[in-house]
């Protein structure tokens, strides 16, 4: 459960991510595909080369969806309900992939903001991304 302090840290640290959704999203997907090649199976129709139009467009969608969650921290599950349905019912994405994506996103954020991110901010972001992953798999039951 995110505390009020966690929520404030997440909102503040998310500003550069939300403003650069395509960059952060594309880098996160590139990192995930490199570190976890099995995740590529969900994107057979994509050009998965770093910086491709497909990765930039889908990466932006991912970050934009997470930005909506950041803007609605008191109802992340409700905010992501349709997205959870899509991934569970239609796309049938293995739930573990949300954790992999969350980890790669945290690494991407740290890579861009290394000196600025304090341990407590990293902890708050990690808690948020963990909760986000749980909310996305809620429709798998």
Swiss-Prot record:
It comes from Naja naja (Indian cobra). One of its GO terms (biological process) is hydrogen peroxide catabolic process. Belongs to the globin family. Residues 1-141 form the Globin domain. Keywords: Heme, Iron, Metal-binding, Oxygen transport, Transport. Involved in oxygen transport from the lung to the various peripheral tissues. The keyword Metal-binding applies. Red blood cells. The lineage of its organism: Eukaryota, Metazoa, Chordata, Craniata, Vertebrata. The keyword Magnesium does not apply. Heterotetramer of two alpha chains and two beta chains. GO terms for cellular component: blood microparticle; haptoglobin-hemoglobin complex; hemoglobin complex. This is Hemoglobin subunit alpha-1. One of its GO terms (molecular function) is iron ion binding. Pfam families: Globin. O2 binds at residue 58. Heme b binds at residue 87.
């Amino acid at each position: 459960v995110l505390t009020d302090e966690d929520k404030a840290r997440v909102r503040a640290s998310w500003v550069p991510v939300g403003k650069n959704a395509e960059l952060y999203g594309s880098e996160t997907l590139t990192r995930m595909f490199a570190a976890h090649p099995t995740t590529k199976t969900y994107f057979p129709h994509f050009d998965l080369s770093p910086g491709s139009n497909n990765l930039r467009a889908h990466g932006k969608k991912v970050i934009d969806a997470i930005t909506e969650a950041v803007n609605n921290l008191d109802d992340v599950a409700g905010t992501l309900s349709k997205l959870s349905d899509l991934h569970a019912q239609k796309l049938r994405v293995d739930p573990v992939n949300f954790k992999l994506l969350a980890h790669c996103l945290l690494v991407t954020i740290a890579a861009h903001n290394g000196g600025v991110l304090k341990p407590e901010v990293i902890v708050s972001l990690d808690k948020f991304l963990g909760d986000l992953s749980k909310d996305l798999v809620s429709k798998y039951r």
